[in-house]
Each structure stands twice: as C-alpha cells, then as structure tokens.
A protein has these predicted regions:
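ATP/NTP phosphate-donor binding region
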Residues: 1-63, 297, 307-319, 326-344
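Catalytic core of DAGKc-family lipid kinases
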Residues: 3, 33, 57, 81-85, ...
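ATP/nucleoside-binding phosphotransfer catalytic cores, i.e., glycine-rich phosphate-binding loops
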Residues: 19, 179-181, 211, 221-344
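Short glycine/serine/threonine-rich phosphate/pyrophosphate-binding segments
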Residues: 48, 70-75, 96
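N-terminal glycine-rich "phosphate-gripper" loop used for MgATP/nucleotide binding
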Residues: 65-69
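Glycine-rich phosphate/pyrophosphate-binding beta-alpha loops
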Residues: 137, 141, 193-206, 272
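Gly/Ser/Thr-rich active-site loops/lids in small-molecule metabolic enzymes
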Residues: 150-158, 208-229
Length: 344
C-alpha cells in the first residue's frame, strides 16, 4: 500500500500550554504504516501559510495545523481549492473549527482521527479578500478581536476580561445589507456575524444551525441589549439557543454586501483587520478538503429540554418587558396574558 504524505505544522506559541511534548506524541501515535511523516515548527507570523503552500506544491496529501484558530486559518487558506487536505490537532484557546467538526480536544484523539483519514469537501467563506472557515464579522466581536490581539496574552480569561470590561459601554452601529441581491431594512446592531461554522470557539454557538456542507452562510444580527439581558445572551450562546432569542435576526445566504456608516474593524476567524464602509462576504461551496471525525454525527451535542425551556422562558420575559416599557398602560394586561399563556 502506498503511504500518504503528511506534514505537521506546529505553532509553539498557540494557546496557553507548552507544545514541547507534541512531537513525541505524534511519533508515538501516528500510523507509520499509513503515513510518510514530516514535522515543522513555525518561527514567525505567516510561516504556517508558507510551509502549507510549499507542502501543497510538493504534492503532500495532508497538512495538519497544530495550534489554535489562527494557525488553522493560516494553513487552511493555503490549501483552498487544492487536492491537499487540512488536518487539525487543536491546541489553541478557542478551537472553533475543531469543535464544530467534533474533533477530540486531546492530541492522541486527534491523531486517531488522522489515522482513520476520512476526508470531506467542506465550504469556506471570504470576507473582502480574506478566507475564513468559522466566522467573520463586525461590530463588537471584531472590536474585541482587536483588543484580544493587542493584549499580548492568550486564553479564555483574557477574552472574558475584555468582553466584561468593554461590553456595556460599546456603541452599536447601523448596517444595511444586500442579501443575494435583495436589500434589507437598516439594522442597528451590537454585532453582525457571518458564520460558515456554528461557533466562535469554546462552544460559544453564534450560529447554531450553521453547516459547512450546505453552500450557505448564516448571517446573525444581534440587536443592542442592556445589562439585565447580558446573562441570557451568554446562556443562549453556550446552550445553542441563540437563534431563538428575541434579540437575534438570522438569514441564510450565498452572497452578502454590508454597508455601514463608517470604516472600522472586521475580523475573520478572530483575526482583526481594518476595512471600509462596504464589506463583501461570499461562500465557496466545497472549496477545501478536511480530515473529519467519522464519529462526529453520533457525538453532536444538542441542547436538552431543560436548557431550551429556560432560554424560551427568559426570552419570553424580555418580550413582555419590552411591551411593558413601551406601553405602560398595558402593564397589567401584558403580565396577565403572559401568565395565562404559560399555564394553558
């Protein structure tokens, strides 16, 4: 049997832990009967993409990104529209694409997926000229991506510190969208996310219904919310119920043009970059080959009945509260109707 050629690209500074033990784990667990293996460490920003491009040009079968979402994006964008497949050993802070694909979060388990070697053709997106594989967007998540990049520290705690410090003082923007050629009304939004995969990372599901095989992007518009609603937004993100929120508008589309009032930050897979007032996002159907978990469908997590019930309950309360605030005369009637509906 002819061996497949596989290259591991290891980012030594991704995430928060040491990567010193990873080469020995790869050596120990990879099936040497199946693979002719090589390992490379990145030495500077953009190096992973250079190694991946050279590997692709050399006819390597699989290039494995060993790192976080930034490393995965660097490697993946070098492999789009080519026969070379992307593999992932997740070692970052969020690991959004790996989590969406239900890959194991430990090195040994991820290598076992590579040993099976099941490859699927998946979609990817492009925002302006930047390919992305999980999410892109603007508004608060792009603002926080910039803060996170400037912080110099990685990890979930750094991210949460920025979110909590900046979230309640952030000023929403107004966006006008053209979705597959059809214009929408203006939306005032806390953030506008366009998702190819379901989550940001850390199992925070910005687009619970997103699929990487449907040839569509999920557009998620989060309306401004106040401090009392913030815990519910967090709960919905973690419970895969954000699409049920009264503060969320969702669309599916192949091509999106976004107009905003002023230039500012956008992000692609968490990498921030400046952009103008018009932003273009499009899907590329089945444009990248990826090694996937053959057991993913059996493992896919769904919100349980209790989680869904709590989310619907709090969202209903938000609707009632809005009616009470905007129509004080109807206060008693609104609350009475809500209680009767729940008891019927």
């Amino acid at each position: 049997m002819t061996k497949r050629r596989i290259v591991f690209i290891i980012n030594p500074i991704s995430g928060t832990g040491s990567k010193d033990v990873i080469p020995s784990l790869i050596e120990r667990h990879i099936e040497k009967e199946s693979y002719d293996m090589n390992m490379r460490f990145t030495e500077y920003a953009g190096h992973a993409s250079e190694i991946a491009t050279q590997s692709k040009d050399d006819g390597v079968d699989i290039v494995v990104a060993v790192g976080g979402d930034g490393t995965v994006n660097e490697v993946a964008r070098a492999l789009i529209d080519s026969p070379t497949a992307l593999g992932i050993i997740p070692c970052g802070s969020g690991n959004g694409l790996a989590r969406h694909l239900m890959l194991p979060m430990n090195v040994k388990g991820a290598i076992e997926v590579l040993n099976v070697g099941l490859i699927h053709e998946l979609d990817y997106g492009v925002i302006n000229e930047h390919p992305f594989f999980c999410t892109c967007g603007m508004g608060f998540d792009a603002f926080i991506s910039k803060k996170f990049a400037d912080a110099g520290k990685r990890g979930m705690m750094t991210y949460l510190e920025n979110v909590l410090r900046e979230g309640l003082s952030y000023e929403p923007d107004t966006y006008e969208l053209t979705i597959d050629g059809n214009s929408t009304e203006p939306y005032k939004a806390f953030l506008l996310s366009v998702a190819n995969a379901s989550q940001y990372g850390n199992d925070a599901y910005i687009a619970p219904q997103a699929s990487m095989t449907d040839g569509l992007l999920d557009v998620v518009i989060m309306e401004p919310f106040d401090m009392l609603e913030a815990p519910q937004v967090g709960l919905d993100l973690l419970n895969k119920t954000l699409d049920k929120s009264s503060r969320i508008k969702c669309f599916k589309a192949k091509d999106i043009v976004i107009h905003r009032s002023k230039p500012g930050m956008i992000h692609y897979d968490g990498d921030p970059v400046e952009a103008g007032t018009e932003v273009h996002v499009a899907i590329h159907n089945k444009g990248i080959r990826v090694v996937v978990n053959p057991l993913a469908d059996k493992k896919r997590r769904r919100p349980n009945m209790m989680q869904t019930a709590f989310s619907e309950f709090f969202n209903d309360l938000n609707v009632v509260r809005e009616e009470v605030v905007t129509n004080p005369v109807k206060r008693v009637k609104a609350i009475n109707n809500y209680i009767q509906n729940k008891l019927s």
